[in-house]
């Protein structure tokens, strides 16, 4: 599933090119996770004012309303003036005078939803309840630590839930906890101020590095210009079960938490 770094990389790869574009048409294929929420003709003539990100959602601001885009489990966006003919898994196109934005989504768990604004119930249903933006200025340590202290959930699962900090997916949660030296099964409320500060810094560091490396391409992720990500090539623990820890040589272990694979070093992450 594309996580925060992949969504941010996608945003950066087409935001400048589509800004100021006028919508000329909409193509809707097979149904996605949620309906568009308006007739496609309503969007024709609208101007694209910018592209933002909130967690794993892209917000395409129009001069009237906005489009919320989620890539689902296997989705990716492409933006270009001359895209090849639509394929069987291309389910949405925003055709503009500056190029076409196309959603490719084989499993159809993604979505494109129109809302009149961020206060629209359709937008609030998708955006409300998420935690702090880890790459934003409001990612304050005090607020983050207070969120940890209030939860008895194992820290790995709390990171994935997105209610304290948003967008830390499975790969990045494993890498963040390794960098912070915290075992994934440790209860969030048991993490004291010193370790919480290390965790806070590790979240910023890992996600920023992942964006810099173009995200992670495990199966089919690519950005809107077709580029693959490379962060997975330098992972310390993710996908390395049984291999020696890059830091101490102890074999990396694998366990299951909430139906997700968790990788950690039992020596470097003792508690």
UniProtKB/Swiss-Prot annotation:
InterPro entries in alphabetical order: DNA_glyclase/AP_lyase_DNA-bd, DNA_glyclase_Znf_dom_DNA_BS, Formamido-pyr_DNA_Glyclase, FPG_cat, MutM-like_N-ter, Ribosomal_uS13-like_H2TH, Znf_DNA_glyclase/AP_lyase, Znf_FPG/IleRS
A Pfam family: H2TH
Catalytic activity line of the entry: Hydrolysis of DNA containing ring-opened 7-methylguanine residues, releasing 2,6-diamino-4-hydroxy-5-(N-methyl)formamidopyrimidine; 2'-deoxyribonucleotide-(2'-deoxyribose 5'-phosphate)-2'-deoxyribonucleotide-DNA = a 3'-end 2'-deoxyribonucleotide-(2,3-dehydro-2,3-deoxyribose 5'-phosphate)-DNA + a 5'-end 5'-phospho-2'-deoxyribonucleoside-DNA + H(+)
GO molecular function, one term: damaged DNA binding
Binding site for DNA: 89, 107, 151
UniProt cofactor note: Binds 1 zinc ion per subunit.
Keywords: DNA damage, DNA repair, DNA-binding, Glycosidase, Hydrolase, Lyase, Metal-binding, Multifunctional enzyme, Zinc, Zinc-finger
UniProt superkingdom: Bacteria
Active site per the UniProt annotation: 2-3, 56, 260
GO terms (BP aspect): base-excision repair
Stretches annotated zinc finger (FPG-type): 236-270
Cofactor(s), by name: Zn(2+)
Role according to the record: Involved in base excision repair of DNA damaged by oxidation or by mutagenic agents. Acts as a DNA glycosylase that recognizes and removes damaged bases. Has a preference for oxidized purines, such as 7,8-dihydro-8-oxoguanine (8-oxoG). Has AP (apurinic/apyrimidinic) lyase activity and introduces nicks in the DNA strand. Cleaves the DNA backbone by beta-delta elimination to generate a single-strand break at the site of the removed base with both 3'- and 5'-phosphates.
Family under the similarity heading: Belongs to the FPG family.
Subunit composition and interactions: Monomer.
Protein name in UniProt: Formamidopyrimidine-DNA glycosylase
